[in-house]
């Protein structure tokens, strides 16, 4: 569930006869035409817990699918020095600075954190780039200059950034498992996380990264 994987699919001729393959995005509802010659295999590079919906349709005109790169090529710049806001489910709200992103289970002060984590950073770009969030544990939502780029809990988290100022805000939800282990007077929480056969190991949480940016091909290239 935490690692990506690759697939190579072949389709029976009777499925493709008189039809064209389309990729349907189940999140946005968009449909994209796949350029797949008869007899050719379809190669998919999928992210963690990712899946794709392929439909064969008689319609043949439409926007051609262009996948985000599985691993953007070119020299990568690692983003460090993040401002972080911690909105705990117990109602407390604190802020801190993180020089390097880390899995919360590796940080004693936050190993049992549960709630909303907001990572903020502003960068200025001389040209359009790819942004790769790296390893993220939990549901995340990226906003750029106040505009949401969508929430995501699966797949590779790679996005386009435009030239100029980019105010990044990445919101990650940390679930309750690690926190429940600390509630020793809560019998329900202890039953599901600590007792006997239901003893749950400490789970990875938050944005471990590394978050990187790298060049993307310009239009026409």
Model-derived regions, located:
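Ligand-binding pocket scaffold of soluble enzyme catalytic domains
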Residues: 44, 159-161, 169-171
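Exposed low-complexity, polar/acidic, P/S/T/G-rich flexible segments that act as propeptides
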Residues: 178-221
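Glycine-centered tight-turn motifs at strand-turn-strand junctions
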Residues: 155, 161-164
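Short, well-structured beta-strand segments enriched in hydrophobic/aromatic residues
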Residues: 51, 164-182
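A generic beta-sheet turn/junction motif
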Residues: 2, 135-137, 163
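Carbohydrate-binding surfaces of carbohydrate-active enzymes
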Residues: 1-116, 124-126, 147-152, 173, ...
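Aromatic-lined ligand-binding clefts that engage carbohydrates, nucleic acids, or primary amines
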Residues: 123-145, 152, 168-172
């Amino acid at each position: 569930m935490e690692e990506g994987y690759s697939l190579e699919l072949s389709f029976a001729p009777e499925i493709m006869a008189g039809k064209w393959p389309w990729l349907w995005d189940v999140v946005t509802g968009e449909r994209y035409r796949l350029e797949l010659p008869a007899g050719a295999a379809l190669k998919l590079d999928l992210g963690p817990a990712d899946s794709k919906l392929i439909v064969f349709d008689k319609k043949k005109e439409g926007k051609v699918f262009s996948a985000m790169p599985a691993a953007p090529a070119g020299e990568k710049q690692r983003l460090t020095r993040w401002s972080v806001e911690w909105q705990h489910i117990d109602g407390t709200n604190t802020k801190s600075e993180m020089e390097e992103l880390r899995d919360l289970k590796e940080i004693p002060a936050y190993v049992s954190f549960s709630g909303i984590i907001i990572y903020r950073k502003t960068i200025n770009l001389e040209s359009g780039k790819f942004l790769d969030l790296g390893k993220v544990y939990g549901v995340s939502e990226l906003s750029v200059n106040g505009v949401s780029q969508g929430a995501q809990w699966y797949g590779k988290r790679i996005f386009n950034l435009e030239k100029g100022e980019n105010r990044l805000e990445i919101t990650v939800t940390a679930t309750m498992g690690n926190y429940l282990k600390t509630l020793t007077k809560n019998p329900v929480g202890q039953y599901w996380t600590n007792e006997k056969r239901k003893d749950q190991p400490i789970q990875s949480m938050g944005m471990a990264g590394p978050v990187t940016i790298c060049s993307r091909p310009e239009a026409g290239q």
